[in-house]
């Protein structure tokens, strides 16, 4: 399907939109000027600066709260205003989803709080962020977050507890 002329023409027309053009242009420049030398976090910050983004939404997993705190400090030090929302926002017990004890991490559905990626997205939408960063949301939770988030977003890191958050490691 990537060779269909109609699809490629529609794709190029999409870049005529001011926001799409700015994102594509600054992404290409960020890639060119940091290729192989800048970390993902540095690339994200350079990209956000070049796009003029200031108010940054940050959706993260509670399991990476220490890392999220460090990332927040770095972003703020570099001039960004950070609005963060943890996955456990709302503090709703997993029983609300119909989850039973046998299907929980610790065996107590009534005391285990569900992740709320829809809540993360809606909170960031309501905060009118310029740009958003997602870090470490569970598989499926990331899907719901992306489905409900209205603004542009990038992924800083995905969670993989087995590989130290490097999910491609097993294929090398």
Question: Model features per residue range: what roles?
Answer:
Residues 1-55, 62-66:
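Electropositive, gly/pro-rich neighborhoods at or near active sites that engage anionic ligands
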Residues 32-36, 107-113, 131-132:
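Short, flexible loop segments at the rims of nucleotide/cofactor-binding pockets, characterized by
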Residues 34-38, 60-68, 90, 132-143:
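Gly/Ser/Thr-rich loops at beta-strand to alpha-helix junctions
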Residues 39, 111-126, 137-139:
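Active-site glycine-rich loop that binds ribose-phosphate moieties when present
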Residues 48, 53-62, 84-88, 131-135:
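Short glycine-rich or small-residue beta-strand-to-loop segments that form or flank ligand, phosphate
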Residues 66-117:
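Long, charge-dense
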Residues 67-74, 142-151:
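Short Gly/Thr/Asp-enriched flexible loops that form oxyanion-binding sites at enzyme active sites
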Residues 150-172:
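Short, flexible loop segments at boundaries between secondary-structure elements
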């Amino acid at each position: 399907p990537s060779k269909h002329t109609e699809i490629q023409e529609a794709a190029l027309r999409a870049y005529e939109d001011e926001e799409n053009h700015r994102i594509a242009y600054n992404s290409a420049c960020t890639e060119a000027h940091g290729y192989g030398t800048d970390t993902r976090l540095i690339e994200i910050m350079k990209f956000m600066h070049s796009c003029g983004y200031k108010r940054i939404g940050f959706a993260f997993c509670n399991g990476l709260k220490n890392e999220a705190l460090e990332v927040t400090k770095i972003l703020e030090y570099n001039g960004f205003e950070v609005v963060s929302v943890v996955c456990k926002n709302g503090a709703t017990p997993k029983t609300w989803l119909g989850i039973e004890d046998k299907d929980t991490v610790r065996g107590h559905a009534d005391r285990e709080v569900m992740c709320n990626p829809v809540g993360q997205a809606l909170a960031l939408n309501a905060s009118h962020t310029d740009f958003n960063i997602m870090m470490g949301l569970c598989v499926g939770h990331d899907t719901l977050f992306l489905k409900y988030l209205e603004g542009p977003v990038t992924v800083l890191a995905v969670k993989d507890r087995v590989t130290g958050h490097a999910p491609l490691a097993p294929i090398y």
